[in-house]
Design a protein with these regions (language model features):
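Alpha-helical membrane insertion/targeting regions
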Residues: 1-247
C-alpha cells in the first residue's frame, strides 16, 4: 500500500500518513509471522493460543487500515480483499470463542457482510473482465472473482451455522481453521507478490515468492482433511496426554 500525499501537505498530515503506513506494514508482518507460528504449533497449546491472539489483533489492524485507505487510492479490489480478511478473521475468532459458534445476531450480521463482499467482488471482477486491459486499478479480474467465491462460501457457512443454531465438533474446528488460513493466505500474497519491490532484484517475478502462499494452502488442506475425515479430534479428546505430543 502506497499513500499519495501532496508535497504541500502539512507536517501533521504527513506524520499521520507515515504512522498509518508504518502501522499497516508492522501489523502485516506480525500477522504473517504469528499466523505461521499458530499454524505450525500444536493445536490448542499455549503457544498456539498466544500466536493466535497476536494474529487476531494484527490482522484486524492491518485489514481495517487497508479497507479504510484503499478506496482513496483508489483500489476497489484491494478494498474487497481487506474487508474479506477482516470478516474471515473476526468470524473465525468468534467461532472458537463463543459457545454458539457465531450463531445469533452476530451470525446474521456476518452473513450479510459476506454476501455484500461477494456482490462487490463479483461486480468489480466483471468490470475488470469487460475492460480493455482485463484489469481495474492494476488488479486483475481473477483476484476479484476469487475473493467473491471465498466470500460466498463463507456466507453459506454463516447461514448454515444460523440454521443449525451453532456449530460444534469437527465442523467448528474446520470453520475456524479455513477462515484463519485463508486470511493468512491473503496477507502472504499481498506481501510476497504485491510488494515485490522490497525484495532483491533476483527474486522479483520469481516463482519462489509463490512458495509461502502454496505452503499456507497446503497446510490448510492437510488440516481440513485431518479434522474432517479422520478421527484426530476424537483421539485428542480420548487421549489428551498422547495428543499433547502431536501437532
Amino acid at each position: 500500500m502506497i499513500l499519495q500525499i501532496s508535497p504541500g501537505s502539512s507536517w501533521l498530515i504527513r506524520g499521520a500518513a507515515a504512522l498509518i503506513l508504518s502501522l499497516h506494514i508492522t501489523s502485516a508482518g506480525v500477522g504473517i509471522l504469528s499466523g505461521s507460528l499458530a499454524l505450525l504449533a500444536r493445536k490448542g497449546s499455549q503457544l498456539h493460543r498466544k500466536a493466535g491472539n497476536w494474529f487476531f489483533v494484527s490482522m484486524l489492524t492491518m485489514s481495517a487500515i487497508g479497507a479504510a485507505v484503499a478506496p482513496f487510492l483508489p483500489d476497489r479490489i484491494s478494498t474487497v480483499a481487506a474487508v474479506l480478511t477482516f470478516y474471515l478473521v473476526a468470524t473465525a475468532w468468534v467461532t472458537v470463542r463463543r459457545n454458539d459458534g457465531g450463531a445469533g445476531p452476530f451470525g446474521i450480521g456476518a452473513a450479510i457482510v459476506g454476501v455484500c463482499i461477494a456482490v462487490a467482488g463479483m461486480m468489480f471482477g466483471l468490470q475488470a473482465a469487460n475492460s480493455a486491459t482485463g484489469v481495474i486499478e492494476g488488479q486483475p479480474a481473477g483476484a476479484a472473482f476469487m475473493f467473491a467465491t471465498v466470500a460466498t462460501l463463507a456466507a453459506i457457512g454463516d447461514l448454515s451455522t444460523i440454521v443449525r443454531r451453532g456449530v460444534v465438533g469437527e465442523r467448528r474446528i474446520a470453520r475456524h481453521l479455513w477462515r484463519m488460513c485463508f486470511a493468512l493466505f491473503i496477507a502472504a500474497g499481498s506481501f510476497f507478490l504485491g510488494q515485490q519491490q522490497v525484495f532483491p532484484t533476483f527474486l522479483r517475478g520469481s516463482t519462489l515468492l509463490f512458495l509461502p502462499e502454496i505452503a499456507v494452502l497446503g497446510l490448510m488442506i492437510f488440516w481440513l482433511v485431518r479434522v474432517r475425515f479422520t478421527k484426530w479430534l476424537e483421539r485428542r479428546a480420548q487421549h489428551p496426554d498422547q495428543s499433547a505430543r502431536e501437532p
